[in-house]
Amino acid sequence: MSWAKQRVPFLDDDDGEEENDVQDDVDSPVPTRPLVIDEDAEPAAGTSGGLEGGGGDDEDGEDGHALPDLDDDLLLQFEPMLPRVYDLLLPSLDARLNFVNAGQKYAAFLKYVHGDCATCSHGEILREKTQLLTAIVSKLMDINGILEGKDEPAPGK
């Protein structure tokens, strides 16, 4: 299977400039250049294989990481999508992904609550699931009411 070169562009700053592939701020604890995944690459010493950008003493990187060769056939390339201020607030990749994911869920919830998702195909599914959950809770409460009613003696007997 042949994969074409793909770049995943994301917004970095509000200035509209495209970010370079080389890290601008050397003092930043998080590298800002893209992660390159190449399944056909030979594993370098000290790496698990397939990932370029890690490794020993390469001449390209100032921080001990090799810069990716952009002339190769790349499968996937990640670029930062958050402003640089989040480098300090969210130091790990997991923290950044969780931040973005929580923001997307919150935005989707607000659209659903305020009715802006009339054209959204997921809106009908959410309404059906809400109705189903309401019906299940109602049945459970009815069962509890029936069981509580059987414990009490009937008023006519």
UniProtKB/Swiss-Prot annotation:
Localization, per the record, is:
Host nucleus
Subunit annotation: Associates with TRM1 and TRM3 to form the tripartite terminase complex.
Main function: Component of the molecular motor that translocates viral genomic DNA in empty capsid during DNA packaging. Forms a tripartite terminase complex together with TRM1 and TRM3 in the host cytoplasm. Once the complex reaches the host nucleus, it interacts with the capsid portal vertex. This portal forms a ring in which genomic DNA is translocated into the capsid.
Give the family this protein belongs to, as stated in its UniProt record: Belongs to the herpesviridae TRM2 protein family.
Q: Which GO terms describe its biological process?
A: viral DNA genome packaging
From which source organism is this entry? Human cytomegalovirus (strain Merlin) (HHV-5)
Its name, as the record gives it, is Tripartite terminase subunit 2
Q: Where is the composition biased (Acidic residues)?
A: 11-27
This protein's source sits in the domain of life called: Viruses
Chief place where the protein resides: host cell
Q: Where is this region: Disordered?
A: 1-69
* GO CC annotation, single: host cell nucleus
